[in-house]
């Protein structure tokens, strides 16, 4: 049985909030955008905005709208067709959000992001600055993945993940993921009528993954992706609330203090800006398999990774590239900027610090990855 945390942070005190709304809550059962539903969401968002909260909206629905405009009976399965649908549907999606929020005298801005935008340090910082300016101007960013130019290998994969990464990027106080499910249950409610809704859990609890199910037809994100997103946000010190968007006035009620959905809390302090950028790397240049001693040194003692703790070097990378560190079971432990190329790392792996100098024949850093350039999972 999963451990449940006592108490819940007063969500009304959260100022900067990333709100992600799934496709099923914005479309008329897949038949294009539901204007009435979106207008209803706009009213709730406007209420929070006018109460002084800073709202960043991550909106799904572009592919579903594109399907209707192109009269497609089913969601495409190949990437080029999905990208084309997203490009067509994005026009209607952003126009609709702009129109309904303008009715509340709120300006919006379209922001399309790719994984490359967040993996490249300069582009990451530029997008941070742009988002901060929009927030300062009291403009609500409407964010979506730039599906048209994303490749299959480097996609976020779902807007839950994108929302979590944006939450870290803007230093959000809270991430709200609205879905067609009530929240996290202690077992699958579709098969167990006695399943109980969990009000508060620790985001980093591995047991959560054992409870998650699959995604729907229109969207890409099931409960598994939402749990993964909550963990990603938690690494940036941001809690996540997963709640049913089918509940009446859910945003207003949650921010008024009503206990709805499941709150995923974080035990970690907020990462530094540099660590948050490192954590944003879903794809890395290579991989270092490390031993149990290195895992303990990194996770429990917050030490740098030394060559002696590296068992295997995978991939081809240069000095300064971002690589991931995994344990012997392949579970990600950390990501960081490596001080050696893959060729040098292969030579010095498993060596004690005093032998590194002898083997390389030059004076340089003794750490494979310094702790200041590492984001721990």
From Swiss-Prot:
Its top-level enzyme class, in one word, is: transferase
Q: Which GO terms describe its cellular component?
A: cytosol
In its keyword annotation, does this UniProt entry include Amino-acid biosynthesis?
Answer: yes
Annotated GO biological processes are: L-proline biosynthetic process
Instruction: Identify the HAMAP family for this entry.
Output: ProB
Which is an annotated GO molecular function term of this record?
RNA binding
The protein's name is Glutamate 5-kinase
Family in the record: Belongs to the glutamate 5-kinase family.
* Phylogenetic lineage: Bacteria, Pseudomonadati, Pseudomonadota, Gammaproteobacteria, Moraxellales
Which sites bind substrate? 60, 147, 159
What the entry lists under InterPro entries is as follows: AceGlu_kinase-like_sf (IPR036393), Asp/Glu/Uridylate_kinase (IPR001048), G5K_ProB (IPR041739), Glu/AcGlu_kinase (IPR001057), Glu_5kinase (IPR011529), Glu_5kinase/COase_Synthase (IPR005715), Glutamate_5-kinase_CS (IPR019797), PUA (IPR002478)
Q: According to its UniProt record, in which pathway does this protein act?
A: Amino-acid biosynthesis; L-proline biosynthesis; L-glutamate 5-semialdehyde from L-glutamate: step 1/2
- The gene is proB
């Amino acid at each position: 049985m999963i451990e449940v945390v006592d108490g819940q942070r007063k969500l009304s005190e959260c100022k900067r909030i990333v709100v992600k709304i799934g496709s099923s809550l914005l479309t008329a059962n897949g038949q294009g955008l539901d204007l009435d539903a979106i207008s209803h969401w706009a009213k709730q968002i406007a209420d929070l905005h006018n109460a002084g909260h800073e709202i960043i909206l991550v909106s799904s629905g572009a592919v579903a709208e594109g399907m209707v405009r192109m009269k497609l009976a089913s969601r495409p399965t190949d990437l080029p067709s999905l990208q084309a649908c997203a490009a067509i549907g994005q026009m209607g999606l952003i126009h609709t959000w702009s129109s309904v929020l303008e009715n509340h005298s709120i300006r919006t801005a379209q922001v399309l992001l790719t994984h490359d935008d967040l993996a490249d340090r300069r582009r990451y910082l530029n997008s941070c600055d742009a988002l901060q300016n929009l927030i300062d101007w009291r403009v609500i960013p409407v964010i979506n993945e730039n599906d048209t130019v994303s490749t299959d290998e480097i996609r976020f994969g779902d807007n839950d993940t994108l929302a979590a990464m944006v939450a870290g990027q803007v230093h959000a106080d809270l991430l709200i993921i609205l879905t067609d499910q009530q929240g996290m249950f202690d077992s699958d409610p579709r098969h167990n009528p006695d399943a109980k809704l969990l009000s508060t859990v620790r985001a980093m609890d591995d047991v959560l993954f054992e409870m998650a199910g699959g995604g729907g037809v229109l969207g890409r994100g099931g409960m598994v992706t939402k749990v993964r997103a909550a963990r990603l946000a938690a690494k940036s010190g941001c809690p996540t609330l997963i709640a049913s968007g089918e509940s009446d006035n859910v945003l207003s009620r949650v921010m008024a203090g009503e206990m709805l959905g499941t709150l995923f809390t974080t035990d970690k302090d907020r990462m530094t800006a540099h660590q948050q950028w490192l954590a944003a790397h879903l794809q890395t240049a290579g991989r270092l398999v490390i031993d149990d001693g290195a895992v303990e040194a990194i996770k429990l003692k917050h030490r740098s990774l030394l060559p002696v703790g590296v068992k295997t070097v995978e991939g081809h990378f240069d000095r300064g590239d971002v690589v991931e560190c995994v344990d012997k079971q392949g579970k990600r432990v950390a990501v960081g900027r490596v001080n050696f190329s893959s060729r040098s790392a292969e030579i010095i792996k498993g060596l004690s610090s005093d032998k590194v100098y002898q083997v390389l024949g030059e004076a340089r850093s003794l750490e494979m990855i310094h702790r200041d350039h590492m984001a721990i999972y």
